Amino acid sequence: MRDKFFQLLLTTAIIFTQQSNLKAQEALKLSLTSCREMALSQSESLQQAEYKYQQSRLDKQIASSAFLPKFEASATGTYVFPDIDMMGMELRMRGTYMAGITLTQPLYTGGKIMTGKKLSKLGESIAAEQKRMTMMDVLVETDNAYWTLIAVRQKVAMLESYKEQMDSLFAQVKTAVEAGLGTENELLRAEASRSDILYQMQKAKNGEDLCRMSLCRITGLDSSTELELTDTTIYVKEPGLLTADINERPEFNLLKHQVNVTQQQIQMSRADMLPTIGLVAGYTYYGNIKLNSLVDAGNGTMMPYSQEFRDGLGAVMLSVKIPIFEWGANLKKVKKAKLDFKNAELELSRNSRLMNLEAQSALKNIYDGYQLIQTAEIGLKQAEENLRVTNNKYNVSMALLTDLLDAQSQWKQAKSNLIEAQTQYKIYETNYLRAIGKLDPTSSPNANNNLFLTE
């Protein structure tokens, strides 16, 4: 009796634990916007881009400080032995100290400081564009994973509906065979079709699980987290007048900045051929320097005498440095910088054509994707009507089983085509925004973005 009581208690505890786990594993509701926010917040690549941007801002501040004077302080202690003999006198420097402060102000550096500041500003702009480019890449990956998961789940739901049709048909054929109104061949055909649907469902569910884990990885969730996507209904209207302008694309701006960088590098190389002028001012205080000697006190008496030196000195210096001859090295540096500038221009020209082609391709995908949706919708309506008519004819023995199976297969394919067309269109929208450089967390097509006429 006691053992049964403990078994009952253990069973109750296990059931309670399982119920608690089921509650804890309730599906997490996610919209496309929330997925984007989560992906951006946990992206290591975006965090690295942010740190590089902060570094570029510090570099700009460092470059600006080159215009300002620099102050340096120094202190020195010296112990010299033995004492230094100076024409019968001894110079004692045991514990001598010096302390001073120096001010250095560049007056002219051939334009290096100004060029360095311009380069630091370009570096900040480059880091900002790289950060924006990384952000876009994260959004593209997130959107692709989101819409792919929706497509797979809709296909699973479609296959489940198809399976219900096949189960009903199989039961109907089986009843007819048992009543002597059908053949075993028809039953085998129905059973084979039902087995094929089960196989396709298993494949689709496996793909769904992989897509879910991929989205969990992108958003920083545990791979076992169940997800409930909210943006499952897709309404699409004809897109408006769109352009393939790449001027806002980060890659295009990066190439333009690179051209400007190489142009400034030419000025930096020329600065090596120009004189530099600097002003140096300093003040030094020294002490504990002693001079020991013997002096005549009168009557031929020599008495020891000691004097300690303790004073401060100030100095102002103007430094001028003029490069005279370096075997043409600086001139060759200028020529090399000019070649880098020409290469950067060629790189900009070549990649601009490629980016224009990519933007035009993305634009074409938008219009083609919309046409595919229209075609798929018409095909689905026709397949649904064909299935309805064929099913009615089969019920009154005016159509063969193979005709009904073909009609069901056509409906499945038409439904699958529409799912693919709709979800692929949403991916095309994201890719288009990426291609023209206007993709950001707020440019969601679901938010009635002005680039797309979506409901």
Language-model features: locations:
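C-terminal segment of classical bacterial N-terminal signal peptides
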Residues: 14-23
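Short, charged, amphipathic alpha-helical segments
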Residues: 121, 184-193, 335, 401-409
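Small/polar-residue-enriched beta-strand and adjacent coil segments characteristic
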Residues: 70-83, 90-133, 256-265, 272-351
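Periplasmic alpha-helical coiled-coil/stalk elements that build and connect Gram-negative outer-membrane
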Residues: 137-250, 260, 365, 369, ...
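Acidic, low-complexity, intrinsically disordered peripheral segments
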Residues: 23-26, 33, 81, 417-455
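Bacterial Sec-pathway N-terminal export signals of envelope proteins
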Residues: 22-70, 183, 223, 229-265, ...
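Amphipathic alpha-helical coiled-coil segments
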Residues: 48-63, 134, 138-157, 211, ...
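Sec-dependent signal peptide recognition
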Residues: 3-11
